């Protein structure tokens, strides 16, 4: 599997500002589709909070304890395992890749596995797309716009193309 310490270039940043899947302005509008997901990954604290508010727990949740760069501590995390990864802003580190892989190996047991990122989790969507099965649904927040729901089968090629544009350290 592809592993790299990489950072964004300006062209990739502009591409990532567009939703990679279907944008729902209101979380509630996506609930039925979320419930029908075979395997669910959430990226971001607000997305994780919204899921747990409705007592929906992803197979894998990736958080950094920040919502729009403000500290946020989750009062209750119902998770079988809490894994840790270091990932500075604007990068995808080997540590993040490996921790996502570890969470995927642990998942599928009906429990929620959380990756707590020291740094920033935003770009974790890309390795999740590349490492997850085609049946996986990934949720993440699009700042000030809503929730993005993407089906991995529809995004693998695009995610690989984005990863290919990263600058290797």
Swiss-Prot record:
Its EC number is 2.7.1.237. It catalyses: 3'-dephospho-CoA + GTP = GDP + CoA + H(+). InterPro entries: GTP-dep_dephospho-CoA_kin (IPR007164). One of its GO terms (biological process) is coenzyme A biosynthetic process. Keywords: Coenzyme A biosynthesis, GTP-binding, Kinase, Nucleotide-binding, Transferase. Pathway: Cofactor biosynthesis; coenzyme A biosynthesis. GTP binds at residues 45, 64, 121. GO terms for molecular function: GTP binding; kinase activity. The keyword Metal-binding does not apply. It comes from the Archaea. Catalyzes the GTP-dependent phosphorylation of the 3'-hydroxyl group of dephosphocoenzyme A to form coenzyme A (CoA). Belongs to the GTP-dependent DPCK family. This is GTP-dependent dephospho-CoA kinase. The lineage of its organism: Archaea, Methanobacteriati, Methanobacteriota, Methanomada group, Methanobacteria.
